[in-house]
Amino acid sequence: FSGIAQVIAAGTVLSDVYLYLGIGLLLTGFAFKVALAPFHMWSPDVYQGAPTTITGFLCTAPKAAGFGAVLKVFMIAFPETFTQWQDLFWVLAALTMTVGNISALVQSNVKRMLAFSSVSHAGYIVIGILVQDMAGISAVLFYLVVYSIMNLGAFAILSMAENDEQDLTFRQFRGLASRNPLLSAAMAIFMVSLAGFPPTAGFIAKYGLFSAAIAKGYIWLVVIAVLNTLVSFYYY
């Protein structure tokens, strides 16, 4: 990757057209992998159709690996082309956050709701990638750890509390607090953290991302992210 960066910096690329075409294809592939809008439509169906334990894995490990690859490729191989792709990342972040949260609002299936929630979190993570410094990298890595723990916990509880794999609706979880107070309390903690309520780890993770972005001048993107976070409070 550093060799690619050296070639680009030296201006010895054979064709800028091929360079930007390659970057575009890479970005499209990564966007599909980590479920960025508008490449996210596979995730709700897959999350709903897969066994709950498998869904917990799908929404964490592949996403963390995908964003790790994005960080390495775009921060090590293509730092010289940052001005060309930063606006596209800005749009992807805003679109992904908004589409994910609005779509999650209207879901009746718990796993589909968490799928669109996962989409919105991908949008938040892109903000950290835009920062392009150590503060952004640290914020992204911490966010991925917190996000993974919260989602693994939430899906573990779903797998223990569910009655029907094919129709895991909110109605099935009515009265969970009286039937199993411990599971109910744990689920509430995970949801509150995913929403970003203080003083949870989710709040600390979002605060780190937003602070790093503000320091780099992405104020309007942070405003959009905060508004989306407020929207997410409703469905969580």
Describe each region flagged by the PLM.
Residues 1-236:
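Alpha-helical transmembrane segments of multi-pass membrane proteins predominantly involved
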